[in-house]
Amino acid sequence: MNKIIKSIEDAQLKSEVSKFHVGDTVKVYAKVKEGNRERTQVFEGVVLKRQNGGARETFTVRKQSNGVGVEKTWPVHSPIVEKVEVVRLGKVRRAKLTYLRDRVGKKAKVKELVR
């Protein structure tokens, strides 16, 4: 049974996925359908977490918009996500940055990784 599920999931995976990690600041280009029009919307923020793997893999991005924290979660292999562009590399020591939800201002910043 697992082989059948694995073969179906492999067929649904994107061939080219951007490499990004937790703590990176990214721009997510997502397709938005409004009525009969389709446009690309850019959402820029810090990657809080990546979950699961394979076809079910998701990632969550958080940003501050007018003083309000906004989080969005997308499947990595979704056709809605056109591309994920890395703006800054972040240096973190945790797999999930949920503690950033409670922080405001400079405390909510992630150190930049210099490579």
UniProtKB/Swiss-Prot annotation:
**Record-level GO BP terms:** translation
Q: Which InterPro entries match?
A: Ribosomal_bL19, Ribosomal_bL19_CS, Ribosomal_bL19_sf, Translation_prot_SH3-like_sf
Top-level taxonomic group: Bacteria
Q: Does the keyword Ribonucleoprotein apply?
A: yes
Q: What's one Pfam family the UniProt record gives for this protein?
A: Ribosomal_L19
Report keywords, A-Z: Ribonucleoprotein, Ribosomal protein
An annotated Gene Ontology molecular function: structural constituent of ribosome
One GO CC annotation: cytosolic large ribosomal subunit
Summary of the function given for this chain in its UniProt record: This protein is located at the 30S-50S ribosomal subunit interface and may play a role in the structure and function of the aminoacyl-tRNA binding site.
Q: Which PANTHER family match?
A: LARGE RIBOSOMAL SUBUNIT PROTEIN BL19M, RIBOSOMAL PROTEIN L19
Family of the protein in this entry: Belongs to the bacterial ribosomal protein bL19 family.
Q: What is this protein called?
A: Large ribosomal subunit protein bL19
Taxonomy of origin reads: Bacteria, Bacillati, Bacillota, Clostridia, Lachnospirales
What would be the name of the gene that encodes this protein? rplS
